[in-house]
A protein has these predicted regions:
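Extracellular/luminal regions of secreted and cell-surface proteins that mediate adhesion/ECM remodeling
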Residues: 23-263
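Ser/Thr-rich, Pro/Gly/Ala-heavy low-complexity intrinsically disordered linkers and tails
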Residues: 1, 10-30
């Protein structure tokens, strides 16, 4: 998700190349093969910055990300997760996952999405993790601090691979309670979360997780391994029997790290 507005109305995979609301021609889904996600380490290295963020009481940032009202010192960064595989990563319509029988009752949800009422759209769970790890004496890494971002809307934000046509995007509709969406990342494209998005940062002055000056490592993992709880889905098992939300041709290139100094 960069800053694209969602497409409205029911959207099927077969309709993506002809949907009249797109404002022009765009791509055709490529489902022959497997996706392969990486984290753009160069984008991470060039985008991180220190600053402040004022959080209003009752705002979506405060409610959804659990940040106390007031001005906070934050570490912002942009995350770009390109799909360099030979096929699309397709999630589809969130409503089909949370309400498969279309009765308005989410009790039969498959657990892949959670509804964010403040923003009135669905967040895809377990797409990525953002960690800030202190570098301890001897070079070991300490207990991670997690960024406040909790959910994701997968889309074709930017072309990534050379030669990719800027009009070849397929997936750009997050979906809401009343509009169908289609989430995914087309081969050769990247899903991008720019540093100015709400919650796209580490809170550095949280008294529960103090972040003193020193050396740290930012670690971004796309499609991370996880152990499911009672509300989670487990669509894919990797070679170590961990759950993944997306099937890929290669899970070994899903992490980017960056060592930084916090003054």
């Amino acid at each position: 998700m960069l800053l694209h507005a969602p497409l409205f109305g029911a959207i099927a995979l077969s309709a993506c190349s002809t949907d009249s609301t797109s404002g022009g021609d765009h791509g055709i889904p490529d489902l022959d093969g497997l996706a392969n996600f990486i984290v753009d380490s160069a984008r991470l290295a060039s985008s991180w910055t220190l600053g402040s963020d004022y959080v209003e009481a009752g705002s979506c940032t405060s409610i959804e990300y659990g940040i106390s009202p007031g001005t906070h010192r934050v570490l912002r960064f942009t995350v770009s997760t390109p799909n360099i595989g030979d096929a699309d990563a397709v999630v589809g319509d969130p409503l089909a996952h949370v309400d498969p029988n279309h009765d308005g009752d989410f009790s039969d949800s498959d657990g892949l999405f959670e509804y964010a009422p403040c923003h009135n759209h669905f967040h895809y769970k377990h797409y990525a993790t953002y960690e800030l790890l202190p570098v301890l004496a001897g070079g070991a890494l300490g207990t991670p601090i997690f960024a406040r971002k909790r959910g994701f809307c997968m889309d074709d934000s930017e072309p990534f691979l050379p030669g990719v046509n800027a009009n070849s995007w397929v997936y750009r509709a997050c979906g809401t309670l009343t509009t169908h969406g289609i989430q995914g990342v087309h081969t050769g494209w990247s899903d991008v979360y720019v540093r100015t998005l709400p919650g796209q940062y580490f809170v550095l002055d949280d008294p529960a997780q103090p972040t003193p000056p020193g050396e740290y490592v930012i670690r971004i993992t796309v499609n991370p391994p996880y152990l499911p709880d009672s509300t989670d889905a487990c669509p894919v098992r990797d070679e170590q029997n961990f759950c993944r939300v997306l099937r890929e041709s290669n899970y070994s290139d899903n992490v980017a790290t960056l060592r930084i100094t916090l003054p």
